[in-house]
């Protein structure tokens, strides 16, 4: 039978067994190498309170701490939440990440178009 993916949908490669992690959405046990991982970096303080904190702070240039959160999803939840998308058989072989869409005043702007306009 033909294989759908060279990696079998995981990143194990000769390890035998990998400890499971729990999906953020449905709490399903997923092998750590198979889980879809995303990292969110946010300020601990919301944008509305940043100015109040900087004015009340004793230190002139105090860098506010950030929250680093690693999110693990099972494959079905990641597809359902559109974190990853189903791709065609030829597109599955493309390993480079897709172009990030940047939003400026409710318009989609690609980095290439922004570079052309700047020059």
From Swiss-Prot:
Pfam families: Ribosomal_S26e. The gene is RPS26A. Belongs to the eukaryotic ribosomal protein eS26 family. GO terms for cellular component: cytosolic small ribosomal subunit. Residues 90-119 are annotated as: Disordered. Keywords: Cytoplasm, Ribonucleoprotein, Ribosomal protein. It is found in: Cytoplasm. This is Small ribosomal subunit protein eS26. GO terms for molecular function: mRNA binding; structural constituent of ribosome. Component of the small ribosomal subunit. Mature ribosomes consist of a small (40S) and a large (60S) subunit. The 40S subunit contains about 32 different proteins and 1 molecule of RNA (18S). The 60S subunit contains 45 different proteins and 3 molecules of RNA (25S, 5.8S and 5S). Signal peptide: none annotated. It comes from Candida albicans (strain SC5314 / ATCC MYA-2876). GO terms for biological process: translation. Component of the ribosome, a large ribonucleoprotein complex responsible for the synthesis of proteins in the cell. The small ribosomal subunit (SSU) binds messenger RNAs (mRNAs) and translates the encoded message by selecting cognate aminoacyl-transfer RNA (tRNA) molecules. The large subunit (LSU) contains the ribosomal catalytic site termed the peptidyl transferase center (PTC), which catalyzes the formation of peptide bonds, thereby polymerizing the amino acids delivered by tRNAs into a polypeptide chain. PANTHER family: 40S RIBOSOMAL PROTEIN S26. Zn(2+) binds at residues 28, 74. Residues 103-119 have a biased composition (Basic and acidic residues).
């Amino acid at each position: 039978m033909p294989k759908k993916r060279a990696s079998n949908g995981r990143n194990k490669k000769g390890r035998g067994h990998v400890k499971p992690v729990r999906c953020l959405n449905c709490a399903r046990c997923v092998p750590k190498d198979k889980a879809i991982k995303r990292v969110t970096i946010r300020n601990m303080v919301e944008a509305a309170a940043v100015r109040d904190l900087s004015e009340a702070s004793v230190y002139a240039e105090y860098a506010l701490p950030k929250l680093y959160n690693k999110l693990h999803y099972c494959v079905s939840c990641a597809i359902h939440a559109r974190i990853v998308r189903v791709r065609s058989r030829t597109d599955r072989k493309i390993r480079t990440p897709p172009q990030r869409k940047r939003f400026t005043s409710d318009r989609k702007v690609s980095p290439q178009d922004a570079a052309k306009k700047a020059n």
